[in-house]
Amino acid sequence: AVPAFDLNDIGDVVVGCAMPEAEQGMNVARIGLLLAGFPVSVPGITVNRFCASGLNAVADAAMKIMTGQCDIAIGAGTESMTAMPTMMGNKVTVNPRAFESDEHVAIAYGMGLTAEKVVQQYGVSREDQDAFALASHHKALAAIAAGRFRDEVLPYTVRSHLPDLSSNTVRLTERLFDTDEGPRADSSAQALAKLRPAFSARGSVTAGNSSQMSDGAAAVLLMSEAAVQRTGATPIARFRSFAVAGVPPEIMGIGPVEAIPRALTQAGIAQADIDWIELNEAFAAQALAVIRTLDLDPAKVNPHG
C-alpha cells in the first residue's frame, strides 16, 4: 500500500523517453509533472537510452536514493509513438560527422534492420519468430483475463475533439481506457505466416513478430528504508543492481546478453536464482537470440507476455 505523504518530499522524478522530441521534447518529465498538478517544487528530468530509457530512469532514481541525495524519488517511462516526428513524415537528423566514413554507418539502421541482422548472425528462423510472437499474445491475453494487470493499470478517460463538417461543429468523444490494446485475440499461426517481411525484401521480421506501436506510460515510486518506515509504505520489491553494456549498433537487440551477467554479478546472485525475467521483445528475433545465448529458461521469460 502507498500511504499519503507530502509530495514536496519527492526529491526528483526521472522519466525515460526513447524519442524525447516534438511533443515529447522540452523535458517531458517536467512538463508532465506540472500538467499532473505536482507541486512546482518537485523537479523532473528526462533521460534517454532508447529501448531502456524507462529502465534507466528507475535506476537513476534508485541511485539518487542510494547516494543520499533524496529519500523519495519516482522513476518512470513514457512514449507516444503516434506523436513521434518520424510518424508524421519528418526525418530524424543525425550529426553529419557520424557518416564521414563507413565506420559508423550502422547508426542509420532502423530497428527492424537490426533485428534482421540478429536473425542472420544468430540463426533465428521465421517459424520460431512467429511462434514466439503468438505465444506472447496468448500469455498477455491470459494475464489480462486473470486480472493480473488490474492493480497496475490506471483507468483513463480518453477525450477526442473531432471536427464534424456536416454540422460545422467540433464533436467530443470519450472512451475509458483500462486494458492494454496490444495483445490480439485474433492472431493465429496461419495469419502470422501470411505476413510479408516488413524491413527487408528477403527477410523474416514482419509486423506480426515485431511489437506494435504504442502510446503509454508507467511509473515506480522508490523510497529509502527510512522513508518506508516513516511513511508506513509496504514495499513490493527491492532494487538490487543495474548494469548496461554496449554492443555493435547493427545488432543492438542483443544488449541483454552482455548486461544481464553484469547485473547478476553486481547483485551477487546466479542466473538460476531468478524466477521471473522481463526481457525486451520489441522483436521476437532479438528475444530468442538472447534467450538461447544466455540459456534462459523460456518458462521464466515474460510469463505475462
Q: Which residues does each PLM region occupy?
A:
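Short acidic, glycine/serine/threonine-rich loops at helix termini
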Residues: 25-26, 83-89, 166-170, 250-252
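Conserved catalytic cysteine-centered active-site region
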Residues: 13, 17-72, 106-113, 185-212, ...
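N-terminal extracellular/periplasmic Venus flytrap/periplasmic-binding protein-like
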Residues: 4, 128-230, 293-300
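Short catalytic helix/loop segments, enriched in acidic residues and glycine
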Residues: 1-2, 32, 94-99
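Active-site pocket-lining segment
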Residues: 15, 114-116, 152-160, 240-305
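Active-site-proximal alpha-helical scaffold in enzymes
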Residues: 48-79, 119-148, 219-226, 289-292
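Flexible glycine-/small-residue-enriched beta->alpha junction loops
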Residues: 70-122
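Active-site pocket-shaping loop/turn-to-helix segments
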Residues: 1, 19-22, 45-62, 100-111, ...
